[in-house]
C-alpha cells in the first residue's frame, strides 16, 4: 500500500498514484483505525497480469474492523486489464471487508474492473465499490467508464457489489470534468456533480452552497494546497500572567493574512 494505517488518520488534499504496478492505495487495517479521507485523488493501481492475483488493484481497502469516512474524492483506474489467471477480490475502487465499516459520500468513482469471466456472487471481482461490511453509500457519482481490454475476454465492471450496505442517491452518469484528458478534474458548468453531494450543511462548499461531488467539494480544502483562507494566528500574548479567579485578562494575537 502507498499508505498503511493502524490508528487514527486524516488524509486531506493528497494524491496516491499506483504507477501501474497493482497494489493498494490506502490500506486501513484494524479496529483502532478511525479514518477520514477527503478531497484526494487515488488512481492507477492497475496491472496487466497473466497470473493469479488476490486483493490487488484496489484504491482504498477497509479491513479487520477498521472504520472510515470517505468524502469528496476521485478514485479511478484500479483494474487488471488481462483476463488470464484468477482475480480474487481485486479491481475495486473501495473494498470493505466483513466486520469493517465506511461512510462513502460525495465521491466520483470510475474505471475500476477486471477483464475476466464472472465467477459468481460469492467471489465478486471488479467493481467501483465492493462491501462485505457495514457501508453507507450516498450522493456519489458511479461512472461506467468504457474500459480498455487487453487479450480479449469479458470485462467485469459493475457499480456496486453489496452484502450489508445501503446505497442511495447516487448518480450513474458522466461527471463531466473540464478536461479529463489533461487531468483537469474541475467540474464543467453542466456537470451533474454540482450541488449534488450530501445535503447536510456540514458538507457545504466554501461559498455556502450545497456540496459538489468530487475532490473540490466541501469546505475542508482549498485547491492551491492550503486548508484555510482565514487569518492564521502565529502567537498569543496574555497579560497579566497571573490573575485571581474571575479577574480580567487581556489576550493579544499576532498573525498573518493568507494571500
Regions found by a protein language model. Give the residues of each.
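Extracellular beta-strand-rich solenoid/capping regions of secreted or surface-exposed proteins
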Residues: 1-7, 21-31, 62
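Predominantly extracellular beta-rich ligand-binding scaffolds that present long acidic/polar faces
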Residues: 13, 28-29, 36-44, 48-184
